[in-house]
């Protein structure tokens, strides 16, 4: 029996612990540690073992990749997370500090999300959009996420799962207006599948004569090489409304124009201001189930407006002759 010595700077995310990440090519050790009359076996990155107090005896050394998919007991079982809690591999894990084993909560970090998705792990989020734990979560239900740290550390100590707790100074995002702590928060979004044309984008970039030439393989080329699907939607009030209507049965339709919207709604809408709140008042019957269709609440990323404006102001691509006018040479 051994314990994975895992570190985190965000105890509040431990409620959502889904996996433990190790670097596949880093050397790890299982060592017997005796400290204050207690002996236990700990797993830690070899070049970080000096941070562990007590008499140490290495029992075995191995690469991180040998730990892959080994299961473990999570620190809290407050919420259900099915088919999870095993060791995963991640090249972003470092041995500059910590223990070389990193706690994964995919709802609260881009790296965690990408790694856990690659293993088919679920994204479970026990925190509401207002930053408070859901009321039915034991111990910290209804508590603001950062205020939950102390209570959770206390629970870790009581259960014997806490190895060490200390103050650790590090950067953390805060609201620039009110200085409230912020969180990375995974939520459903609408995407443009830009990855489906990634090869074509790279091919056209290679055939483009850039000035200065360094942009071709530098800033722009690097951006194309690291292209991911574009999260188009934004949860704001101001902006171009996402033109998607949905009914209670999840049927959806993307409306192309005010003319089409007027036809669907049976109204003359040529003079409608196509922004919130006015466009949100337009509803119509679903063609598949007759339920009422309402517009989804999201607006579009303003960069979409910026990119479309030079062409859309001249009626592209709907106005006759506009496609030929903007044909690339």
Regions found by a protein language model. Give the residues of each.
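Residue patterns forming the tRNA-binding/recognition surfaces of aminoacyl-tRNA synthetases
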Residues: 1-15, 27, 35-37, 66-69, ...
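Generic recognition of flexible, low-complexity loop/linker segments
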Residues: 17-18, 58-61, 89-91, 111-113, ...
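Carboxylate/His-rich catalytic cores and anion/metal-binding grooves
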Residues: 28-33, 39-74, 296
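Basic, alpha-helical terminal appendages of large translation-related enzymes
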Residues: 35-39, 57-61, 162, 167, ...
